[in-house]
Structure formats: C-alpha cells, structure tokens
Amino acid sequence: MSPTTAAAAANSADAFVPVDEGTQIQIHVTAQCSGGACTFNTATNLVVGGNPVPLPPNTWARENITLRSSNRNVYQDVSYSAPTGAPPINRGSWNGPVNSRQLKSQNSALVSVTFNGGGSFEEFAVDGTSLPLDVRTGKPNTESNFIACADIQVTYPGVNLTTATACTTTHF
C-alpha cells in the first residue's frame, strides 16, 4: 500500500476489515512532525453501524507499527507508550494486559504490541515520538519525510482477522 502524503506537518490514514455485514475492525494511524521530532499514534476499534465501539472484553490482538523515512540514511530514535498514557519506553515492556517490544534497524523501527482483554478505546491505542537522525552525522534530519504504518490482528470468539496496513506520510 502506498502511504498517504500530506503537504502539511500532520496526516492520518485508516484501514478496515469487515467482520460481518454491519461490523468492521478499524485501525487508525496519525503522524505529525514539528520542532525536530515526529509524533505518531495508532488506535483500533470496531465500527458498528458507522459508529466506533471498543473491542469486546475477551479480545487478543497483535499490532505492528513500522516507522521509517523514504531516505535510507535516516535513523528513527523511537520511544512509545503502550497503551496510550503508560510511561514512555524505548525497548519493550509489560503494562498489565499489554506487552510490547521494539526492534530497530539502521533506517526503521518496528514496535510490536500484544493486547490481552478488551476494554476502553485507550487500551488499544499506542502513541510515541521519533527523532529522525542522519545516520552519518547523528544530527536531526528534518529534510526527509516520516512514514508511520500499522496493521493489527484481532481475535475474539468467532473472529480472527488482520487489517490491511494503514500508512501515512508527513514532513516537517
């Protein structure tokens, strides 16, 4: 999927997968860059009759978030909160029913989050910050774009589905 691009410093994207005739799983990704840093957030919910509703109490889900630039010489120094509101981390953690880890490479970061149990919208949301750095100099790179992509596998009784990848691109 090709990322949606914004001329401004913020952008968002959604992906859906149908569960049945009236229900869909939605993943939403937002990215914004300013002041040398990019923020991102993701949120997952059901959409029933056009309205967002939380996932059911017995949900297990795994979300993958990829953060990168189209410039292969940009390193993403990422910290994130999983779920939203938890203390920011840069490696991985266990926050109650949410387990996460981060895998880094020279030009991208992958945040993998496992959710156990349903609940509020916030429980299936992740937010964070990336400092795009030039690999050669270690200095902030505000010339290149920032791409945030996410997909999620959601399982609960009778359902085991994975969304398409939602990608958004923004610039400083």
Language model features by range: what are they?
Residues 156-172:
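Short beta-strand elements
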Residues 41-43, 64, 147-151:
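Beta-strand secondary-structure signal
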Residues 76-130:
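Extended, solvent-exposed segments with strong compositional bias
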